Amino acid sequence: MFANADIVISAWDGARLVGVSRALTDYSYCCYLSDLAVDVAYQKHGIGQELIRRTQSIIGEEVSLILMSAPGAMAYYPKIGFALADNAYVIRRKR
């Protein structure tokens, strides 16, 4: 999973992993944020937003950042600057 990622960023509290983001990108047009996970005990402290900010810092302003949200996180992303896309299609995975 991580071996094929272009960008992996982690957040730690001492020796405890509390957050991780994983992205795939061409570094010129788009970056797909495939995973964003923060330990429930550490949510609502800006960790997810910081993981995204660091991803954006790596890809730069000229690269679009896109993602597929988990249903429970749909309300989160607009709060941190994402816009709902009305021009996207998906072929869902079979498993």
Language-model segments: which ranges?
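Conserved acetyl-CoA pyrophosphate-binding loop and the N-cap/start of the following alpha-helix
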Residues: 42, 46-51
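Short loop segments at secondary-structure junctions
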Residues: 14-15, 41-42, 93-95
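Hydrophobic adenine-recognition pocket in adenosine-nucleotide-binding enzymes
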Residues: 36-38, 73
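A conserved beta-strand-loop-helix scaffold within acyl/acetyltransferase catalytic domains
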Residues: 1-36
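Conserved active-site alpha-helix within GNAT-family acetyltransferase domains
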Residues: 61-67, 71-95
